[in-house]
Amino acid sequence: MLKEILSSALLMLIMIDPSDKILLVSLLREDFHIEDVKSLIIRANLIGFILLLLFAVAGKIILQDIFHIELDALRVAGGFVLFKIGLEALEGGGMVTIKREKNILALAAVPVATPLIAGPAAITAAITLTAEHGIIVSIVGTLIAIAITAALMMIALYLMRGISKTALSVTIRIIGLFIMAIGAQMMITGAGGIVLNLIKGA
């Protein structure tokens, strides 16, 4: 079982992809106090784990049988959210617009916990791992991947402390461009999947 757990954790870590979470932490560092961002990281990863746990247990029923939602539709919606955040950062707004509208807990839920942590790829992995290896392997593997993601986000947060305001401002805009690209790719992938399904169904 150990081999299955480790391979499941690796797959889930790849699907979660900590790199874009690290980029977002860099954005948050400009607009929020470091203690608030630390709190956000913990809450976001906890919420992300709960969501993935839910989908690992009953993902197929929730998505397809109850709400009739395809994963490609989630990709498009999640990509739009990320694209909007990246655009604000690129224009120099950072997370200010979101900060005015939502408290730190709400921001931890959206967009950090979902779609960044519990995104379409991670949700698909949770459902697949449960089907292939059972619920225990899926849950433990997901927990390990979430713990690694949270640790990397914390490390990135402290590394950003030594960067000057000017360098941080330039970095924020570059990061914003990458986040826009991630969001655009999610939308393209999702839209492509929707079109392909429509063609197959025709």
From Swiss-Prot:
The portions of this protein that span the membrane are 5-25, 47-67, 76-96, 104-124, 135-155, 174-194
Q: Which UniProt keywords apply?
A: Cell membrane, Membrane, Transmembrane, Transmembrane helix
Q: Give the membrane topology.
A: Multi-pass membrane protein
Cell membrane among keywords = yes
Q: List the subcellular locations.
A: Cell membrane
In terms of superkingdom, the source organism counts as Archaea
Report the InterPro entries cross-referenced here: Multi_antbiot-R_MarC (IPR002771)
Gene Ontology CC annotation, any one: plasma membrane
Major site of localization recorded for this protein = membrane
**Membrane recorded as keyword:** yes
Q: PANTHER family this protein is in?
A: UPF0056 MEMBRANE PROTEIN YHCE
Family the entry assigns: Belongs to the UPF0056 (MarC) family.
Q: What is this protein called?
A: UPF0056 membrane protein PH0214
